Amino acid sequence: MSAHIIDGNLLSQQLRQDVATRAAALSAKGKQPGLAVILVGADPASQVYVRNKVKACEDNGLFSLLEKYEADMTEAALLARIAALNNDPAIHGILVQMPLPKHIDPTKVIEAISPRKDVDGYSVLSAGELLTGLPGFRPCTPYGCMKLIESTGTKIAGKHAVVIGRSNTVGKPMALLLLQANATVTICHSGTADLGYHTRQADIVVAATGRRNTLTADMIKPGAIVIDVGINRDDNGKLCGDVDFAAAKEVAGHISPVPGGVGPMTITMLLVNTIEAAERETN
């Protein structure tokens, strides 16, 4: 029997209705939530991502400020612009689209964003808050993955979860969020011997490697929840994830597709974080 397909578009729409309601309530008090998005350079993929984020804001009652700069913008100029936005009361979240040109240090840029406005959840402070269980902004992609898992109705506590990937933006925070939900968590990566040994024991698998067919059907425990974070292209140029979806869906209990799974949820959780930032500022 085929797995239940976890529809990220549908869940995203449901969550965005709540975002729009909360945004309207804030706007009625004269406190419309505002997100500043900065794009440096003309990377085609980044332009698409930025356009989608701005449209999501506009569709759900948030104010968006899009600032585009040439690739030769200096690091000092970018840091100065972030400092100005930090002090702008109309802006509750600041997002600098990655990747940046090579002459700009991304860590410096992320750390320049006020912790109150770090709606991407990438700063060292945000990571520390997540690690210690303090309230803070969770990175949008892992946050969205958790919502997808929760939508299956599965009780996460006591389950064995395997996260494939250890990036600062997805793998590590994903493991921490699962740990907070009382799952038993294993982190696998490029240095892991016999990946399949670990994944076959997992009730929940999150694949976040950026490599096609990292997770194949024979590596999945029957009935497991499989969340595919990857964005890749197959031999025909068609969008695909890290999981061999066609075969995996015949073994898994629940599985997220690519596209239409994690992608829309990432932008939705950015909206949620921005709303939370505005609500904190207002309260």
Swiss-Prot record:
Q: Which SUPFAM superfamilies does this entry report, sorted A to Z?
A: Aminoacid dehydrogenase-like, N-terminal domain, NAD(P)-binding Rossmann-fold domains
The answer to whether keyword Lyase applies is: no
GO terms in the biological process aspect are: L-histidine biosynthetic process; methionine biosynthetic process; purine nucleotide biosynthetic process; tetrahydrofolate interconversion
Q: Which residues bind NADP(+)?
A: G165, R166, S167, S190, I231
Q: In which pathway does it act?
A: One-carbon metabolism; tetrahydrofolate interconversion
Listed under catalytic activity are: (6R)-5,10-methylene-5,6,7,8-tetrahydrofolate + NADP(+) = (6R)-5,10-methenyltetrahydrofolate + NADPH; (6R)-5,10-methenyltetrahydrofolate + H2O = (6R)-10-formyltetrahydrofolate + H(+)
Q: Known Gene3D superfamilies for this protein? A: Leucine Dehydrogenase, chain A, domain 1 (3.40.50.10860), NAD(P)-binding Rossmann-like Domain (3.40.50.720)
**Which CDD domains does this UniProt record tie to the protein?**
NAD_bind_m-THF_DH_Cyclohyd
- Stored Pfam families: THF_DHG_CYH, THF_DHG_CYH_C
Tell me a Gene Ontology molecular-function term this record carries.
methylenetetrahydrofolate dehydrogenase (NADP+) activity
- Give GO cellular component annotations, separated by semicolons: cytosol
Which UniProt keywords are present, listed alphabetically? Amino-acid biosynthesis, Histidine biosynthesis, Hydrolase, Methionine biosynthesis, Multifunctional enzyme, NADP, One-carbon metabolism, Oxidoreductase, Purine biosynthesis
Judging by the UniProt lineage, the source's domain of life is Bacteria
According to its UniProt record, the EC number is 1.5.1.5, 3.5.4.9
Q: Which family is this protein grouped under?
A: Belongs to the tetrahydrofolate dehydrogenase/cyclohydrolase family.
- Please name the NCBIfam families in this protein's record: PRK10792.1, PRK14186.1, PRK14189.1
Relate the protein's function as given in its record.
Answer: Catalyzes the oxidation of 5,10-methylenetetrahydrofolate to 5,10-methenyltetrahydrofolate and then the hydrolysis of 5,10-methenyltetrahydrofolate to 10-formyltetrahydrofolate.
Write down the HAMAP family for this protein, in alphabetical order: THF_DHG_CYH
What is the protein's name according to its record?
Bifunctional protein FolD
Which gene is annotated as encoding this protein in its UniProt record? folD
